[in-house]
């Protein structure tokens, strides 16, 4: 039996990954992390979606220690989430240091226990957000370290790594879940479901990708299929 664990926030990217994983694996587990995040409403959204889509199990892990150690606008109400600045340089204040290091490591430990062969994460380098822990080289390096530390190869899969946001919408549509991802996921840094606040970087990236996809579905769908190998 093929098993996988999805790092699942209930947002656009991880929900699209879950939808695809359910087609590719016999048994899919979801892991969601409570780190005292500003957009904590995502945890309830993740619960609802994991149940609705048919995940075998859904674990919510308490990692609130991360909140104490990692200062970010997503872990401190006193630090405002900035409006979208497409030309901004450097690492944005929404970056949570160590988040993906911790999430992927804990997901791999869970995968070890349930005998899953893969951990799936929705990180993406194409629409680079300025987060160093979304880079392909980081994921590959951590995957190697985790496999060495467990004496077991658990594969880290990044199905969205080389597709952009418009193509991510196309992927959801390919599996017949465009409306679900659009209306029932939570991507917004301010914790608003669906189209979100419309001002933060996450909302703008999501909206721009959707508009691009809806404006030229055939071209974007073809590009997504070419990059992912889907027929």
UniProtKB/Swiss-Prot annotation:
Signal peptide: none annotated. Keywords: ATP-binding, Ligase, Metal-binding, Nucleotide-binding, Queuosine biosynthesis, Zinc. Its EC number is 6.3.4.20. Binds 1 zinc ion per subunit. The keyword tRNA processing does not apply. Zn(2+) binds at residues 188, 197, 200, 203. ATP binds at residues 8-18. GO terms for molecular function: ATP binding; ligase activity, forming carbon-nitrogen bonds; zinc ion binding. Pathway: Purine metabolism; 7-cyano-7-deazaguanine biosynthesis. CDD domains: QueC-like. GO terms for biological process: queuosine biosynthetic process. Its cofactor is Zn(2+). InterPro entries: QueC (IPR018317), Rossmann-like_a/b/a_fold (IPR014729). It catalyses: 7-carboxy-7-deazaguanine + NH4(+) + ATP = 7-cyano-7-deazaguanine + ADP + phosphate + H2O + H(+). NCBIfam families: 7-cyano-7-deazaguanine synthase QueC, PRK11106.1. PANTHER family: 7-CYANO-7-DEAZAGUANINE SYNTHASE. Catalyzes the ATP-dependent conversion of 7-carboxy-7-deazaguanine (CDG) to 7-cyano-7-deazaguanine (preQ(0)). Belongs to the QueC family. This is 7-cyano-7-deazaguanine synthase.
């Amino acid at each position: 039996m093929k098993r996988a664990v999805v790092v699942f926030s209930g947002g656009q990217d991880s929900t699209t990954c879950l939808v695809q994983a359910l087609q590719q694996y016999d048994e899919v587990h979801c892991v969601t992390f409570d780190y005292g995040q500003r957009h904590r409403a995502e945890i309830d959204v993740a619960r609802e979606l994991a149940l609705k889509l048919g995940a075998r199990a859904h674990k919510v892990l308490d990692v609130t220690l991360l909140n104490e150690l990692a200062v970010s606008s997503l872990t401190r109400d006193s630090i405002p989430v900035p409006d979208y600045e497409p030309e901004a340089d450097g690492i944005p204040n929404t970056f949570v240091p160590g988040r993906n290091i911790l999430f992927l490591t804990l997901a791999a430990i869970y995968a070890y226990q349930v005998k899953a062969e893969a951990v799936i994460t929705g990180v993406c380098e194409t629409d680079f957000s300025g987060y160093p822990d979304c880079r392909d080289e980081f994921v590959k390096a951590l995957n190697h370290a985790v496999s060495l530390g467990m004496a077991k190869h658990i594969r880290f899969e990044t199905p969205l790594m080389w597709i952009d946001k418009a193509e991510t919408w196309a992927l959801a549509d390919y599996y017949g879940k465009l409306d679900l991802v659009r209306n029932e996921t939570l991507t917004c840094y301010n914790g608003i479901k669906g189209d979100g606040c419309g001002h933060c970087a996450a909302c703008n990236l999501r909206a721009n990708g959707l508009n691009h996809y809806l404006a030229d579905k055939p071209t974007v769908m073809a590009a997504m299929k070419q990059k992912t190998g889907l027929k």
